[in-house]
Swiss-Prot record:
Keywords: Nucleotide-binding. Nucleotide-binding protein. Belongs to the YajQ family. GO terms for molecular function: nucleotide binding. NCBIfam families: PRK05412.1. PANTHER family: UPF0234 PROTEIN YAJQ. InterPro entries: DUF520, UPF0234-like_C, UPF0234_N, YajQ-like_sf. It comes from the Bacteria. The keyword Disulfide bond does not apply. GO terms for cellular component: cytosol. This is Nucleotide-binding protein HSM_1099.
Length: 163
């Protein structure tokens, strides 16, 4: 019985490259000259800390980070950007979390989406991934297209294809 897994993974070396590119762009930007501004990656906690002197510059810094992520083929919705910023002394900061794995609520949304489409496949949650199996490859390909076209707020990859 053919099957595949739906996962949500980010390659950390691509994130590291995106953060380094954003820091390079930051060092050449005229509007950030003489301003204390940093973009730091914490790989163990899977977070990116963005710090600068004003709220407006913080938003500009996040735009720089998002554009460098997009250039590295990292979708911007894989970054969980908080709405409000932390303010301490003269610095504003945001701690951006990286979305890794599929949480149970999101997995249930994916399964409901597939069930509502009435495709002849079986789904099951396995930790931080969703296993989809069916009798026909065509049904599996239709499921992949359905999940790709759905706006669920998180990027998904499809791997572990088995025949």
């Amino acid at each position: 019985m053919p099957s595949f897994d739906i996962v949500s993974e980010i390659t950390l070396y691509e994130i590291r490259n995106a953060v380094e590119n954003a820091n390079r762009v930051l060092s050449t930007r005229y509007d950030f000259r003489g301003v204390e501004a940093t973009i730091e990656l914490n790989e163990k906690a899977e977070t990116i800390k963005v710090t600068t002197e004003s709220d407006f510059q913080l938003e500009q810094l996040i735009e720089i980070l998002i554009s460098s992520c997009v250039k590295r083929d990292i979708q911007h919705n894989s970054l969980d950007i908080p709405a409000d910023s932390e303010h301490s002394g003269k610095l504003y900061s945001k701690e951006i979390k990286l979305k890794q794995g599929i949480e149970t609520d999101m997995a249930k949304k994916i399964i409901k989406l597939i069930k509502d489409a009435k495709l002849k496949v079986q789904t099951q949650i396995q930790g931080e991934q969703v296993r989809v199996s069916g009798k026909s490859r065509d049904d599996l390909q239709a499921t992949i297209q359905l999940v790709k076209n759905a706006e669920l707020g998180q990027p998904f990859q499809f791997n572990n294809f088995r025949d």
